[in-house]
């Protein structure tokens, strides 16, 4: 697994129109966030901070059991760090999902289940607010929000916490704990 370094740095690539993370040794990671959702500081060069490294390690630990390849796990963890640090505040889009029970407060890095009439998706909590959380799709397959709108791997969305169910790991598979 890729280990964070104090030589890593964030920068915005105008040509690619994307936030990038320079990993050194001629390796660059392209963040999966649209420029229109980035806060102003995302367009300035800055170091990969101690907080970024701590968040990266936390996300890596929480996704270790997911049925993803190592490169995909790194991609997911780095996109989580970027969204946590550089994503503009957003309003919840809870109407896409069914209520699964009140009183659930997920922790950052936790894997949760979100359901609707079209299926069930698995998401990682990027940031937890009082009643809602920004989460990111961890499934490789697209998740249908409605018949015409789909989410892709590593795409973020903010959802009310009552739409989420905690996940339980059984032999590297995950299941929702409801009730």
Curated annotation (Swiss-Prot):
GO terms for biological process: division septum assembly; FtsZ-dependent cytokinesis. It comes from the Bacteria. Transmembrane segments: none annotated. The keyword Cell cycle applies. Belongs to the ZapC family. Interacts directly with FtsZ. This is Cell division protein ZapC. It comes from Aliivibrio salmonicida (strain LFI1238).
